[in-house]
Regions:
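General small-molecule cofactor/ligand-binding pocket signal
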Residues: 51, 134-136, 250
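Short internal loop-to-helix segment that lines adenine-nucleotide cofactor pockets
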Residues: 63-83, 130, 134, 143-151, ...
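Non-catalytic surface loops within mature trypsin-like serine protease
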Residues: 54-56, 142, 151-153, 223-225, ...
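Conserved acidic-Pro-Pro-aromatic motif
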Residues: 180-287
């Protein structure tokens, strides 16, 4: 019976794919409730076995894919032998794909601070036998030290460096800058994915040397202006910093659009002034 109900839920859910209906809180709450009660323990994603978090926060048991446009983009932009950083690796959806794309001659560094997520990330990497992945249970930010990290009481993707109504508890966790962590790395870094709940600005400030030394580094980051502000980052300053060192921006809005289109700072700030209930991804690439 549980499988039949899940199948009905899955078909109903797919009707709304590409509509961004998930931006609404009541929809997210309903999905969390249904996912918690109906989801399987694991799913297969492109040949990879993935154990899910308690509420299937990425809806992988429903969609079989997460952020389709971004998933397709990384397949085009990441190549065999590349070095990739997954900042905010969660339970490993992108980490596993990166590991396959870079192959045995490449390397993936996956950063995930939250303990339960980290254990699932480790389990998913190990069960798929990816020995080209390095797992790091640290926060990536603009300083090294111990920081307070707030754990969401609703799902596994809403953990933040600032306190909100969603926070159920907090933990102390080690923070690092990418400049410090990779100061002795001899290979170039090719690609960074950042999804850290508004912490992208601080993480960027902590990788100034890395950005300088890796001229062709490509970045995908979450664009959530309100989260940046709550992390004491001015969204415009963050974009201008990247623009100053040669980056152009491309919008990945998660709807049914097929093209990833260039967008200016002015257009971004006008289109997503606060993004209180919605966020997108940005592809940042030097011309």
């Amino acid at each position: 019976m549980k499988k039949k109900i899940h199948a009905i839920y899955k078909k109903s859910f797919k009707i709304f794919i590409g509509t961004n209906i998930g931006r609404y809180g009541i929809v997210r709450k309903l999905c969390r409730f249904l996912s918690y009660n109906l989801k399987p323990d694991w799913v297969e994603i492109e040949g990879e076995k993935m154990y899910l978090d308690d509420v299937d926060s990425l809806c992988l048991s429903i969609n079989g894919i997460h952020e389709k446009m971004l998933t397709n983009l990384i397949k085009k932009e990441i190549h065999s032998g590349d070095v990739v950083l997954d900042i905010g690796a969660h339970i490993g959806y992108y980490t596993l794909q990166f590991a396959n794309l870079v192959g045995s001659t490449g390397k993936v560094y996956a950063f995930e601070p939250e303990p339960k997520n980290f254990e699932l990330l480790k389990k998913n990497v190990q069960i798929n036998k990816h020995d080209n992945v390095v797992l790091i249970q640290k926060i990536v930010s603009d300083k090294d030290g111990i920081v307070e990290f707030f754990i969401s009481k609703f799902d596994s993707i809403g953990n933040k460096l600032f306190k909100t109504n969603e926070a159920g508890s907090s933990i102390k966790i080690e923070s690092t800058t990418l400049d410090e962590y990779f100061k002795d790395l001899k290979k170039k870094i090719d690609f960074i994915k950042m999804d850290i709940q508004g912490g992208e600005g601080k993480a960027t400030l902590g990788m100034k040397n890395l950005l300088k030394e890796n001229k062709n580094l490509k970045i995908v980051q979450e664009w959530w202006p309100d989260g940046l502000k709550q992390n004491h980052t001015n969204p415009e300053d963050h974009l201008k910093f990247l623009q100053h060192i040669g980056y152009k921006f491309y919008e990945i809005d998660g709807t049914i659009k097929k093209d990833i289109l260039p967008i200016t700072i002015e257009q971004l700030l006008g289109k997503y002034p606060n993004s209180l209930i919605e966020d997108i991804n940005l592809f940042c690439k030097k011309s």
